[in-house]
A protein has these predicted regions:
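Sec-dependent N-terminal signal peptides
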Residues: 4-13
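Sec/Tat signal peptide C-region and signal peptidase I cleavage site
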Residues: 15-19
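N-terminal carbohydrate-binding/catalytic regions of secreted carbohydrate-active enzymes
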Residues: 21-140
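Extracellular/periplasmic catalytic domains that process cell-envelope and extracellular macromolecules
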Residues: 47, 59-64, 145-153, 166-167, ...
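Structural recognition of the beta-strand scaffold that forms the well-ordered cores
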Residues: 65-70, 103-107, 154-160, 200-205, ...
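Solvent-exposed loop/turn segments at secondary-structure junctions
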Residues: 72-76, 110-113, 162-167, 206-211, ...
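Active-site-proximal segments of metallohydrolase catalytic domains
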Residues: 114-190
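Metalloprotease/metallohydrolase-associated module, dominated by Zn2+-dependent proteases
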Residues: 175-221, 237-286
Length: 286
């Protein structure tokens, strides 16, 4: 049985909508990042709707790592190497954990600046057109079964090519028949040689539609923006029982799409982040 917080269906009656929060009885937690026409946009520090996050007792990832999984032959630049978009994403991850854009979350439960890396795995087999959540989990497990490192402090980010879309239940990303979200993060249990691990992962489908693109952003910038959002949320609320507000919104949900995504440290794409310290959205830590 799933407990689902869904306000997306009531867009004609409400001035804004929220992230779709899905908590299952097996401990799996999923948070869908809405398209830009479905986001709340709290904006100004101390402004209307400035409702701080509360801590609900669950774990955070105090010293996180990032790992990119590029799924499909489309990530080939034609010479057998990763293309420019994938290469830029690795550059983004290699510096993200030390930026002010990341350090803003250190106010939550002792989270530290992260040693995010540019480690990756490239699976050149092509994914199906519709990549369900179970298929995405199977792809992460495929990496593990091929000798990949199993680590419960790593966020495994799976990048999909433009020939595929992501689906979770009846909701889809760009390219699917029921467009609702641009990306999401979740978790699952994996039995490794060193015991059961709580694996954190994110689905990063290709931002091929207007609802998941920001004016002036390149495709890589849009990916970076979503990776920023999903990585920080997977760190501050990995299992759905740590940091979120009374409506179920996690830190990045409260600043999704408004204020406007921006080009920040290193020229990469970022999202504003909720700060309890100022009761509003900020670009970086002070």
């Amino acid at each position: 049985m799933k407990r689902i917080l869904v306000v997306l269906a009531f867009l004609s009656f409400a001035p804004f909508a929220f992230a779709q929060r899905i908590d299952e009885t097996n401990g799996k937690h999923t948070q869908l990042y809405p398209t830009k026409d479905k986001a709340p946009g709290w904006a100004k520090p101390g402004g209307a709707g400035a409702q701080n996050l509360s801590y609900h007792g669950g774990p955070v990832i105090t010293q996180a790592k990032a790992f990119a999984i590029f799924w499909g032959s489309q990530w080939n630049d034609g010479t057998g190497h990763l293309n420019a978009i994938a290469s830029e994403m690795l550059g983004f991850f290699s510096q993200f954990g030390g930026t002010g854009e990341y350090k803003v979350i250190t106010q939550y439960s002792g989270i530290q600046p992260a040693s995010l890396t540019n480690a990756f795995w490239w699976d050149q087999s092509d994914p199906p057109a519709n990549v369900t959540d179970s298929a995405l989990v199977a792809e992460v497990v495929k990496y593990f079964n091929q000798g990949g490192v199993v680590d419960d402090t790593t966020v495994y980010s799976v990048f999909l090519p433009s020939t595929s879309y992501s689906s979770f239940g009846t909701s889809d990303s760009c390219g699917g028949p029921h467009l609702v979200y641009c990306a999401y993060h979740s978790n699952f249990s994996f039995n490794s040689s060193s015991g059961t691990k709580d694996i954190k992962y994110s689905s990063l489908p290709y931002p091929s539609c207007g609802g998941c693109q920001w004016p002036g952003f390149s495709t890589a910038n849009n990916f970076e923006h979503f990776a920023c959002h999903e990585t920080r949320e997977a760190v501050t609320d990995p299992d759905g029982n740590a940091w979120f507000d009374r409506r179920g919104n996690e830190a990045d949900d409260k600043c999704a799409w408004s204020p406007a995504p921006f080009l920040g440290t290193g020229g990469y794409g970022y999202q504003w982040e909720w700060s309890n310290a100022v009761s509003g959205c900020v670009q970086t830590a002070p």
